[in-house]
Amino acid sequence: MMGEKISVIVPVYNVEAYLEKCVESILKQTYTNLEILLVNDGSTDSSGELCDQLAQRDQRIRVIHKENGGLSDARNRGIEEASSDLIGFIDSDDYIDEDMYETLYRQMLESNADLSMCGHYDVYHQIPEKQVAAIQTWELTPQEAIKMVMEAKILSVTAVNKLYKKELFEHLRFEIGKIAEDAFIMIALIHHCRKVVATNEKKYYYVHRENSITTQKFSLKFLNVIEAYEQNATIIRENYPELADVATMRLNWAYFYVLDRLLVDADFKDKVLEDRLIAYLKKNTKNILLDSRFTRARKVSFLALCLSRKLYTKILLAQTKR
């Protein structure tokens, strides 16, 4: 299929073991009118040299070497360098189905949307999840898309399994120096759309290198997750008041996310932060217990937290070892 050129931005940092598989999956796309921007973000392994070697294989590949600035900085550089009006992002340790961009472009064209999304596989130990049983496509208003993305049952906040009109980034960039960079920008991007189109068909393979939160050391950077969803809640409450409950739910989720990682790291202790996170969640007890989007297991463990954080931590550790 040949339509408008798509600029595919691939930030590269110390991924010599994964990069070739990622790039090969892009080169094999049935949608061939691509510009592939490999943004080498100051790699200290052989990734930079590998980028140059890959560029010799296909004239559609362009390599940008820069000093290390992080994932967001590399993506932003790619946006600035992109020569087309359509943009996609792929993380360099992931890979895609051969018709992902054909699917995203076709549904964008047919629906006259500004943003096109597909589903993704979570890949653990090189084994992907199953494809969805019933493939569906939706044409969505920004409000409908925000609801589906925030609920995260079908669509996700991730930047990578999507095709964007470049004009969406006219006044928006990825936040530099923070984790959860996708969560900081996605709701704002959707808010600037006239229409969004999405399919639940999985076309992107999101590779997880670590399978357990117990292997991750806690960092105060995890607080960026709360910051991102506070920012999203502000956008939603100001522009989509009907979705206030979704904003509240996702903010509660963010507090759980940070608290869980803090409690399972035996080497990091911050009683003041623990108390602040728990106090926020307890203040939202009614919202948590009455929201059907929280699982029964989450609600039971939350009730345990209200009784004893030691008990909650034991439950958490038992769950993560399964």
Set out the residue ranges of the language-model regions.
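Glycine-rich, basic loop-to-helix element that forms the pyrophosphate-binding segment
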Residues: 66-82, 92
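Catalytic core of nucleotide-sugar-dependent glycosyltransferases
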Residues: 203-209, 216-243, 257-287
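A conserved acidic beta->alpha catalytic loop
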Residues: 25, 32, 40-49, 67
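Membrane-interface aromatic/basic loop that binds lipid-linked glycans or pyrophosphate carriers
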Residues: 264-322
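Short aromatic/hydrophobic "clamp" motif used to bind/position activated sugar donors
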Residues: 87
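N-proximal low-complexity "stem/linker" segments adjacent to membrane-targeting elements
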Residues: 1-27
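Acidic helix N-cap motif at the loop->helix transition within catalytic regions
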Residues: 20, 34, 45-54, 77, ...
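Donor-binding/catalytic cores of nucleotide-activated saccharide
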Residues: 71, 92-197, 207, 211-220
